[in-house]
């Protein structure tokens, strides 16, 4: 299943703050999407359309999440994936979102070259870390926090640079007008009775 921060929506944000090794604050909230949640996403996450029916819109939730983050460093597993969605959502609402971050996936690749899989689930299994609801935002965040603490305990003394935060970067691509070749292809497909939800004049591609 391929998702793209430019074309797909966030339906849930989950995060937590850790102070002195303990969870001090939590952020858990659904976002009301503009389109219906697909059966594939429901199958993966367990989140249904009924669950988000009364959720707040993206602008309201993302504003509160940015306030929640304050100046803290973000930690995530393949963090650029989550950061790209959050940044794109914020940008659509005219809100800035620039953060420093630490990626537990990059750390795992450095300190565990012998492991075939460095996915969050595989690493949690390796270290016997419980994840009560995999693919749900808050529980994945909690599992990642525990994973980071574990990796830091075992490996940071000998690999301090690996655990240093860095600036998270994701360039939001500006839509570009479709090329004449693309428009001609769409017209041919339309004549062959292939249907699209896009008006050809409004169709765009990302550079």
Q: Across the structure, where does each feature detected by a protein language model lie?
A:
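A broad detector of short, well-ordered amphipathic alpha-helices
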Residues: 12, 122, 139-142, 188
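A short, structured active-site edge motif that brings together acidic residues
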Residues: 99-109
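Acidic, divalent-metal-coordinating active-site segment for phosphoryl/phosphodiester hydrolysis
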Residues: 136-149
């Amino acid at each position: 299943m391929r998702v793209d921060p430019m074309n797909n929506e966030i339906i849930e944000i989950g995060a937590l703050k850790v102070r002195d090794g303990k969870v001090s604050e939590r952020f858990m909230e659904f976002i009301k999407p503009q389109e219906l949640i697909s059966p594939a996403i429901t199958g993966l996450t367990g989140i249904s359309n009924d669950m988000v029916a009364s959720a707040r819109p993206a602008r309201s939730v993302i504003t509160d999440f940015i306030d929640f983050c304050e100046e803290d460093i973000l930690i995530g597993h393949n963090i650029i994936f989550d950061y790209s969605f959050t940044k794109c959502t914020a940008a659509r609402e005219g809100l800035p979102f620039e953060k420093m971050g630490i990626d537990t996936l990059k750390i795992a690749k450095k300190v565990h070259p012998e492991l075939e899989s460095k996915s969050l689930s595989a690493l949690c299994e390796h270290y016997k870390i419980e994840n009560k609801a995999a693919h749900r935002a808050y529980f994945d965040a909690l599992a990642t926090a525990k994973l980071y603490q574990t990796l830091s305990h075992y490996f940071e003394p000998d690999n301090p640079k690996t655990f240093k935060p860095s600036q998270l970067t994701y360039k939001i691509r500006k839509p570009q007008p479709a090329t004449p070749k693309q428009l001609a292809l769409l017209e041919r497909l339309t004549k062959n009775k292939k249907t699209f939800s896009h008006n050809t004049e409004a169709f765009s591609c990302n550079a």
